[in-house]
Regions:
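Short linear segments in intrinsically disordered or otherwise low-structure-confidence regions
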Residues: 366-372
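Alpha-helical transmembrane segments of multi-pass small-molecule/ion transporters
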Residues: 1-366, 378-385
Length: 385
């Protein structure tokens, strides 16, 4: 129980993140896979079903990205009711903000940052721009969940981004990069793998769990599932740093050169949209969901396109992305929860209290606030001065 509290406590979670990175780099060095050429997860799964996948140490570890993402997303999906999804679809203002941020601002903002910081390096420039044109369709649900945001709304926004980027991704690639030859179906396949499968299993788990254990019993069971999100996050970090640790050890300047514009992008986009949501009268949960859906980038799609349509150097540039994005987005979760206590009338519960069962009678102290609770109580912000 004490370990669970440490995992969910944002005062100690950064140490687990750093430890996972170090373990990943150590594993990569020990097995000689720290500069591994990644196969896009979708292609790897197809090859497995066709009986053509070579289960080397590196290839097997690479499948851990898929497993880690599932472990992160599935617990959040068990937190969702079908009725919550119906209510979340009636949020046109939130949807418009996400659409404007992701398709009118984000691609061009990332392009401007690439021009400022990477103008002399065509490969890194292309990799950064490519990373910026595709909104995230998976991990933003996890970060919304960790920040105690509106997970059903985040899911609806992700579904919108999934469809929109299938149409707009080739357009932005053409405008900002030039002629790019890639299959847009890879976006649809990623939606099924990272969104559809966890959603279906999560809804089925909730339905079966409530039928067998009752609402209160399932909530206590789900508190244990919540730990999988953090475990999946740390496991994904181990895998990514294990396969690409040489980027940091042998050529840290590549990471640093990519880290500066990417960190600026994430902090500016998140805080701008988060504050905009507050000013527009959103409650904390909605403001967080909208901000993360406007900030996160789809590194799986960016890497897949880079591998299939560009030089290896561009692929390396996109592979740096998640090494930077995940720790930065975790810091944004911390910022959201800290600032939420000041900006919004209803205080935001500490993360460890929200995700770990209490020691009191019944152990029900970990019930989350928000759309997934049986009686949602949305916080309302005070009128800005």
């Amino acid at each position: 129980m004490r370990l669970l509290r440490y995992l969910h406590d944002f005062r100690t979670l950064p140490f687990f993140v750093l430890f996972s990175m170090a373990v990943g780099i150590g594993i990569g060095k020990a097995f000689g896979i720290s500069d591994y050429e990644l196969t896009p997860p979708i292609d790897a799964i197809k090859d497995i079903f066709r009986g053509r996948y070579d289960f080397t140490i590196g290839n097997t570890l690479a499948l851990g990205v898929v497993a880690g993402l599932f472990l992160m997303i599935y617990p959040a999906m068990t937190n969702i009711r079908v009725d919550d999804l119906g209510a979340a679809t009636r949020s046109p203002k939130q949807l418009l903000i996400v659409a404007f941020a992701n398709y009118a601002i984000a691609p061009f903002f990332m392009f401007a940052l690439a021009e400022v910081f990477l103008r002399g390096d065509e490969d890194l420039h292309t990799g950064l721009v490519l990373y910026g044109i595709a909104p995230c369709i998976a991990m933003v649900i996890v970060f919304t969940f960790l920040a105690l945001g509106n997970t059903p709304l985040a899911l609806v926004l992700v579904a919108f981004n999934s469809v929109a980027q299938m149409i707009l991704l080739p357009v932005y690639a053409k405008i900002l990069i030039g002629n790019v030859d890639f299959d847009v179906l890879v976006v649809g396949e990623s939606v099924v793998l990272y969104l559809g499968l966890p959603l279906v299993l999560g809804l089925l788990t909730r339905r079966a769990g409530v039928a067998r254990l009752g609402e209160a019993g399932f909530e206590r069971f789900r508190e244990g599932l919540n730990t999988l999100s953090v475990v999946g996050l740390l496991f994904t970090l181990v895998v990514m740093f294990g396969l690409k640790g040489d980027l940091i050890v042998n050529d840290p300047m590549i990471v640093l050169r990519m880290a500066v514009p990417m960190t600026i992008f994430f902090f500016v986009m998140f805080n701008a949209v988060y504050v905009a949501g507050w000013r527009l009268g959103f409650n904390y949960e909605d403001a967080v969901a909208v901000a993360f859906n406007s900030t996160g980038r789809d590194f799986e799609i960016a890497i897949a396109i880079a591998i299939t349509a560009f030089s290896p150097a561009v692929a390396v540039a996109t592979e740096v992305g998640p090494l930077i994005e995940v720790p930065v987005m975790l810091s944004l979760v911390w910022i959201a929860m800290r600032s939420g206590q000041r900006l919004f009338a209803a205080p935001v519960a500490p993360l460890e209290a929200a995700l770990v069962p209490s020691d009191g009678p019944g152990g029900a102290g970990g019930e989350r606030r928000g759309a997934a609770s049986s009686a949602p109580t949305w916080s309302e912000r005070p009128r800005p001065m």
